[in-house]
Regions:
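A charged N-terminal "starter" segment
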Residues: 1-145, 187, 191, 225, ...
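Active-site loop/helix belt of alpha/beta enzymes
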Residues: 2-3, 153-297, 388-390
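Short, glycine-/Ser/Thr-/acidic-enriched flexible segments
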Residues: 39, 63, 86, 107, ...
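Conserved, mostly hydrophobic/aromatic
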Residues: 40, 61, 83, 115, ...
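Short acidic, glycine/serine/threonine-rich loops at helix termini
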Residues: 69, 92, 112-117, 134-137, ...
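Structured core elements
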Residues: 78-80, 101, 124, 148-150, ...
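Glycine-rich, aromatic-flanked loop segments that form ligand/cofactor-binding clefts
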Residues: 144-156
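Charged (often Lys/Glu-rich) extended helix/loop segments that serve as interaction or gating elements
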Residues: 259, 273-406
């Protein structure tokens, strides 16, 4: 994994932003997550360098840790939030309200009131009833919020596990009905100011992403003409993927930027004041995180080797429930050749608790420290943190040779 070597390996040793493994596993109890601030900044700058005309909104759902949010806020990112608690986290981390977009398919009156009181850049509507609720709340608060209409487009579906367009969906207005449906509620306080389209997650296909960006640009202009709303913001969603298996290639961000340069330039020439947004979570933070757990016992059973660790699906559930094989390393033995095929398991009393099946590792022994890579997104908060009362893993952030609890 190229990013792992780039961000975490120095002279054959596991090091996060200058802090060696011994300084982590010796000082803090395993299991824990460690995040590299340098890695987060690097991924943000890469995206911003190739798409300078876009505001990059960090999707807090990927990792709402305040320290992670702070790194991205100070780097210049905005925020995309999906709950009142995420909104509060973003504001506490220092994100300006004008840099925040609120995206959630089930909004209550209390949710909408909190969002409108905060004065975010935009709130996304998924249905005509959403528009009615936003309008009623705006009237009661005497505010004039900016609304983005989310659209379930008719575009071709990409090859991805989580696809949110092209078929029936709980998300957004169906493209073929959006003009009629959005015209239903009479809006006197809220105003439709643009569109949002989030098509899929974890997309590595550059050609499809280029087609998606062009599709959304055309659709935004078409709807603006047909409905008469002033196009102030176009939110393209996210979906930028990362390598999740050893065989995966990285997303060619430079090639993607080159592929959409002409349609973007034409759009900007027509609408130079229109704000363009990308939402990005996994792409920015996943590769910046490693889940660290310690081997308690090694067992061989009927031809299989099991490394039974102090952290499993209770602390890192994603590999189990999403069936994703996060690359594994013995962090204290990076310079040794892999000679064994190992099932890395946790302490939970279920056979489901295997966080890395058939991992190719040096033959493990008790006391070894296992790292699961690309664990910076959908790790801690997606896990079964109170299952079997095992205790919660720590979160640590390393930044320029300083390690602290995040």
């Amino acid at each position: 994994m190229k990013r792992f070597e780039e961000f975490f390996v120095r002279d054959g040793r596991f090091v996060a932003d200058g802090v060696p493994l011994e300084g982590m596993a010796g000082k803090y109890e395993t299991p824990f997550y460690v995040y590299s601030a340098t890695a987060i900044r690097t991924k943000y700058r890469l995206l911003k360098e190739h798409f300078p005309a876009f505001d990059i909104c960090y999707s807090l759902k990927a990792n709402p840790n305040p320290a992670v949010c702070g790194v991205l806020m100070r780097s210049g990112a905005g925020a995309e939030v999906s709950s009142p608690a995420e909104l509060a986290t973003a504001l506490a981390a220092g994100f300006a309200p004008e840099s925040i977009v609120y995206v959630a398919p089930a909004k209550t009156a209390a949710d909408v009131e909190q969002v409108l009181r905060a004065g975010v850049h935009a709130i996304v509507a998924d249905a005509a009833s959403d528009l009615g609720l936003i309008e009623a709340t705006a009237r009661s608060l005497a505010v004039k919020p900016r609304v983005l209409v989310r659209i379930n487009t008719k575009e071709t579906q990409p090859e991805a596990k989580e696809v949110m367009v092209g078929g029936p969906s709980k998300f957004g207005f169906d493209e073929e009905r959006v003009v009629a449906d959005a015209a239903g509620p009479k809006l006197e306080h809220a105003r439709i100011a643009g569109i949002q389209v989030y098509s899929a997650s974890q997309v590595l296909n550059r050609a499809w992403l280029a087609e998606h960006i062009e599709y959304v640009l055309r659709l935004a202009q078409q709807l603006s003409r047909e409905t008469g709303f002033r196009l102030e913001t176009v939110d393209f969603g996210g979906g930028f993927g990362i390598p999740q298996h050893e065989r995966d290639a990285e997303l060619d961000v430079a090639g993607l930027a080159e592929a959409v340069a002409r349609p973007l330039a034409e759009f900007r020439a027509d609408l130079p004041e229109c704000r363009l947004l990308f939402e990005s979570g996994r792409y920015l933070v996943a590769e910046a995180g490693v889940f660290v757990t310690r081997v308690v016992r090694v067992k061989e059973s009927r031809g299989r080797v099991f490394a039974i660790c102090d952290g499993g699906m209770n602390a890192f559930a994603r590999p189990v429930f999403m069936r994703i094989k996060h690359p594994a390393r013995l962090l204290n033995r990076l310079d040794e050749h892999a000679t064994a095929h190992v099932d890395v398991c946790g302490p939970i009393c279920t056979p489901l608790d295997c966080i890395a099946r058939d991992a190719h590792l040096p033959m493990p022994k008790a006391g070894d420290v296992v790292g699961l890579l690309s664990a910076g997104a959908y790790g801690y908060t997606m896990s079964l943190l109170d299952f079997m009362s095992r205790g919660r893993p720590l979160e640590l952030i390393a930044d320029t040779e300083e390690l602290r609890r995040a």
